[in-house]
Amino acid sequence: MAQPKRFQINAKHYFLSFPKCSLSKEEALEQLLQLQTPTNKKYIKICRELHEDGQPHLHMLIQFEGKFNCKNNRFFDLVSPTRSAHFHPNIQGAKSSSDVKSYIDKDGDVLEWGTFQIDGRSARGGQQTANDAYAKAINAGSKSEALDVIKELAPRDYILHFHNINSNLDRVFQVPPAPYVSPFLSSSFDQVPDELEHWVSENVMDAAARPWRPVSIVIEGDSRTGKTMWARSLGPHNYLCGHLDLSQKVYSNNAWYNVIDDVDPHYLKHFKEFMGSQRDWQSNTKYGKPIQIKGGIPTIFLCNPGPQSSFKEYLDEEKNQTLKNWAIKNAIFVTIHQPLFTNTNQDPTPHRQEETSEA
């Protein structure tokens, strides 16, 4: 007579199902953690569900650091802490931890311990699995959640194509720049020259009312005169200080105008595109794809006097005569000699803003 087959499972990941188990997830986890095994436990996930007959069931995924050769079919038995009852599971080696994890997630009443170990395998296999992974990523609530899904379900793509995946998810989960809230109303700037007020009335407005080619403005003046705070109080805008970042995280194509603050005109990229309110232009990035700029909005250039800041001095350089002739047709130039506000109408301009810009 053939000997009965001995129980033995040699696996790194185990899938346990406890039918009619009244233990809570926390009680089950506490007992599992007390089990002595030759290899360390890395991750445990427990799901509690109620079947149609109302009986509670527990499903568990256990991941070990190395393979665990289990020869005792009672090894994972659990006991009730309040009554004389044992709970015996169905024990299987988990061919795909990702599939088991997804399966026991279905009811939502779960408890996790440790860090999930990605195995990169799926019982479903093939192209369908890759499609499922990316579909799940698209349906995730955020970029970080989508990256976690791809890392778990498509680890090869995650490693080999991370740059493209990361860039594409920036577009899929594009978050518009947080709107700037000015600490001062534009009306609190009571010393604004008439030519600035007139320029605002003619050029700063939403797309429906805006001129097809608005005129930009260059405002030059000493530090702490309120140029930056005034310029930022006029409406929805893009604020670019020190250097130009046209990424979607910073730059919005729905802004009414741009503010370029404290950028040396000698090194100002896209000088004509900004000053000329040009439409539909591209900006090449060093490590990414070109960025499409909708344009058609005016720009406020803020600067201080001096050879490394003043737009007037820059355009007066002999080599820039042609550019100067173009600039005076596309922008007005205003020099201010006193603050745009009085102390009775607002406190001195915040130091934090001025520390980042000498404008």
UniProtKB/Swiss-Prot annotation:
Database matches in InterPro entries: CRESS_DNA_REP, Gemini_AL1_CLV, Gemini_AL1_REP, Gemini_AL1_REP_central
A molecular-function term among this protein's GO annotations: DNA binding
Cofactor binding note from Swiss-Prot or TrEMBL: Divalent metal cations, possibly Mg(2+) or Mn(2+).
Chain positions covered by the region annotation Oligomerization: 156-176
Cofactor: Mg(2+); Mn(2+)
Annotated TM spans: none
Compartment(s) where it occurs, according to its Swiss-Prot or TrEMBL record: Host nucleus
GO biological process, one term: DNA replication
Location of the motif RCR-1: 15-19
Motif RCR-2 location, chain numbering: 57-59
Active site: Y103
Residues binding a divalent metal cation: E49, H57, H59, D107
Motif (RCR-3): 103-106
EC number: 2.7.7.-, 3.1.21.-
Alphabetic keyword roster: ATP-binding, Covalent protein-DNA linkage, DNA replication, DNA-binding, Endonuclease, Helicase, Host nucleus, Host-virus interaction, Hydrolase, Metal-binding, Multifunctional enzyme, Nuclease, Nucleotide-binding, Nucleotidyltransferase, Transferase
Binding site for ATP: G221, D222, S223, R224, T225, G226, K227, T228
Function of the molecule: Essential for the replication of viral ssDNA. The closed circular ssDNA genome is first converted to a superhelical dsDNA. Rep binds a specific region at the genome origin of replication. It introduces an endonucleolytic nick within the conserved sequence 5'-TAATATTAC-3' in the intergenic region of the genome present in all geminiviruses, thereby initiating the rolling circle replication (RCR). Following cleavage, binds covalently to the 5'-phosphate of DNA as a tyrosyl ester. The cleavage gives rise to a free 3'-OH that serves as a primer for the cellular DNA polymerase.
Domain text: There are 3 rolling circle replication (RCR) motifs. RCR-2 is probably involved in metal coordination. RCR-3 is required for phosphodiester bond cleavage for initiation of RCR.
Subunit structure: Homooligomer. Interacts with the replication enhancer protein (REn). Interacts with host retinoblastoma-related protein 1 (RBR1), and may thereby induce the transcription of host replicative enzymes even if the cell is not dividing anymore. Interacts with host PCNA. Interacts with host SCE1 protein.
Name of this chain's protein: Replication-associated protein
Naturally occurring in which organism (per UniProt): Tomato yellow leaf curl Sardinia virus (isolate Spain-1) (TYLCSV)
